[in-house]
Amino acid sequence: MTRPVVTRFAPSPTGFLHIGGGRTALFNWLYARKHGGKMLLRIEDTDRQRSTQPAIDAILDGLKWLGIEWDGDTVYQFARAARHREVAEQLLAEGKAYRCYATAEELTAMRDKARAEGRSKLYDGSWRDRDPSDAPADLNPTIRLRAPLTGETVIEDQVQGRVVWQNENLDDLVLLRGDGTPTYMLAVVVDDHDMDVTHIIRGDDHLINAARQKQIYDAMGWELPVMAHIPLIHGPDGSKLSKRHGALGVDAYRAMGYLPAALRNYLVRLGWSHGDQELFTTQEMIDAFDLSAIGRSAARFDFAKLESLNGHYIRQTDDQSLVTLLEDLLHYVPQGPAIAARLTDTTRAQLLQAMPGLKERAKTLLELLDNAGFIFADRPLAVDTKGQTVLTPETRALIGRLRAALEDVSPWTAANTEAAMRTFAEQTGLKLGAVAQPLRVALTGRTTSPGIFDVLAVLGREECLSRLADQAA
């Protein structure tokens, strides 16, 4: 009987949930869901100096926002230190590990010598078979794995293929430090085994760890999980991903106005493909996802492509949901509190009414919010630099005449205000654009906005006539 699929996402809480970590979590989640299994979450908080509660909170919040729900309780690695020590002691008792009393100075000398000779194996194994009676009384030993000296350690990786290491080049890795704390290598193996993890899907920067961890599995006689080391994410120029490329936390993408569904769709296509398909519903991702379709080459992050995809998702989202998403965004942007203070039943209704025009122009929720600024603006409007160039003495006089032409419009609708403006343009011999642009600046403070007649309808008669009066000569 085959074991049920269990994957895991195991971040270190030393910072935010990186975009690469978000993709790793997504791949683990998709694989587990496709096979009717579970994805577990383990917080690898053994680095007590760098692990922080705010980072843990950011990871949990980021996963939830992305729509990645893990199964069962969150496991905290540090809390399992006693179990990790128990395994190290078992290996010691079985002769598969040994106490190493090398001093810091001796270890430094070994490393320097190995590097000078071009050897990757840095520890010389001097305490591997040494008589324990030689041990200095004042030094707490580390516990090292008695790794094989000959032969090969082989990983049949689902992405990288067959990967082989010569054992003569691998150190006897430390399992327990001198102070009794377990190392990352030991803790990961013990936790994955105890959590019944069947598939380890992680970045290929962990590939060298796979060889060392397999040696622990072998020493314990445990079954090695299936491994899939996925390529890292690079910038558009092929260099290591940096902040200028998009190496930000998932929380930053939320604050920049990306929809979780759009970011999920973008991330799944970074390194994985399903024919030429670009757009996926969540269920389509689950149905199609397969480790064999992950490439070995580094994926390239393209902000323009993400923006375009996000714009598509915004246009496909219903108007009421976008209003809700905008309200949520206010918690994460500097101008949020000021706009939130202006949110009333009236402005919410105006936002909903304006949404069809707003969402056609926006690639992010932040752009959408910015374009909706005219709804929340105080009188008299702050007019931007481009708008100021439109407001000449002549156009201010024109605005006064426009206001008079609009006063008798009833009922106040986009169609009726448009008819009044077209009549005004014909009577004055002006092109509609020459009428619309001063009107736009007077009502929004900008030279760009949603359709001007939609703006008139959204703001309503009283507000429009008041704003026009503010700017009229």
UniProtKB/Swiss-Prot annotation:
It comes from Rhodopseudomonas palustris (strain BisB5). NCBIfam families: gltX_bact. PROSITE patterns: AA_TRNA_LIGASE_I. Catalyzes the attachment of glutamate to tRNA(Glu) in a two-step reaction: glutamate is first activated by ATP to form Glu-AMP and then transferred to the acceptor end of tRNA(Glu). PANTHER family: GLUTAMATE--TRNA LIGASE, GLUTAMATE--TRNA LIGASE, MITOCHONDRIAL-RELATED. This is Glutamate--tRNA ligase. It is found in: Cytoplasm. Transmembrane segments: none annotated. A motif ('KMSKS' region) lies at residues 240-244. It holds the Pfam family Anticodon_2. Monomer. Keywords: Aminoacyl-tRNA synthetase, ATP-binding, Cytoplasm, Ligase, Nucleotide-binding, Protein biosynthesis. Its EC number is 6.1.1.17.
